[in-house]
Regions:
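A short alpha-helical cap/connector motif
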Residues: 2-161, 168-189, 193-242
Length: 242
């Protein structure tokens, strides 16, 4: 018997690109970077020298087989948190502490990050990362539970920044909750917005890519957002709520 998620994914495969075979404005012939493009990407990734704390956290995450954002993504997260002077932020998916370190490094001095992840081990690792970086423990609030059970209980309109970086198959649901949580002028960040650079390939119909396409289309159709799609790391979707 097909689950609701499987039926939904099958509908996306049948319908998502029937007319154009791609997202509007994306040319599949131009989606694969040349060698010069790759060199430019690598240069931009390394432009901001990562801190020792980031290097240690990133290396530890990879050694443990845990996901970790690139140095360019980390630098962008710090920059964006500083840009909006974030006092209160939520991250969906703890990412072994690398994203938490990046966000808290840019947030206001007493800013608090709430991190929601179903895996307690990820959050324990994150606490160790932040301890080594000498970030106060009261600035990092962890909730080890299914984000879709937790997010509806958080106060709407109370957060300056929300990072989506959890289960890719839940991105559409995360997106809805993230927009509810943001204050007016708050910033939404969605990691892996280019689906590990598979997004522009119309032949790629894997589950993660289909859901990320759907999430991006939802953002495009949502009024009251100012958006940008940035090819840093594996892609960041940025959206400011009116």
């Amino acid at each position: 018997m097909l689950t609701a998620r499987t039926r939904h994914l099958n509908r996306l495969r049948r319908c998502a690109f029937e007319d154009t075979g791609r997202l509007e404005g994306v040319n599949p012939q131009e989606s694969r970077p040349s060698q010069l493009d790759i060199a430019s990407w690598e240069y931009s990734e390394d432009f901001v020298a990562p801190s020792e704390a980031f290097r240690n956290a990133h290396a530890a995450a990879l050694e443990d087989g845990l996901p970790a954002v690139t140095s360019g993504t980390a630098a962008m997260l710090t920059f964006l948190a500083r840009l909006v002077s974030a006092q209160a932020a939520v991250e969906i998916g703890t990412d072994a502490g690398v994203t938490a370190l990046s966000l808290l490094s840019g947030m206001a001095q007493r800013g608090v990050l709430t991190s929601v992840d179903p895996e307690a081990f990820h959050q324990e690792t994150a606490r160790e990362v932040l301890k080594e970086a000498q970030i106060a423990t009261n600035r990092f609030r962890t909730i080890a539970s299914n984000p879709l059970d937790v997010l509806p209980k958080l106060r709407g309109g109370a957060y300056d920044l929300v990072l989506i970086n959890g289960d890719r198959l839940e991105y559409v649901e995360y997106l809805s909750q993230a927009l509810r949580l943001l204050r007016s002028g708050g910033l939404l960040i969605m990691n892996d917005a280019l689906a590990s650079y598979h997004l522009a390939d119309p032949d790629n119909q894997d589950d993660d890519t289909l859901i990320i396409r759907e999430a991006l289309e939802s953002v495009q159709q949502t009024e009251g957002l100012t958006t940008s799609l940035v090819p840093v790391g594996v892609g960041l979707l940025l959206a400011v709520k009116d």
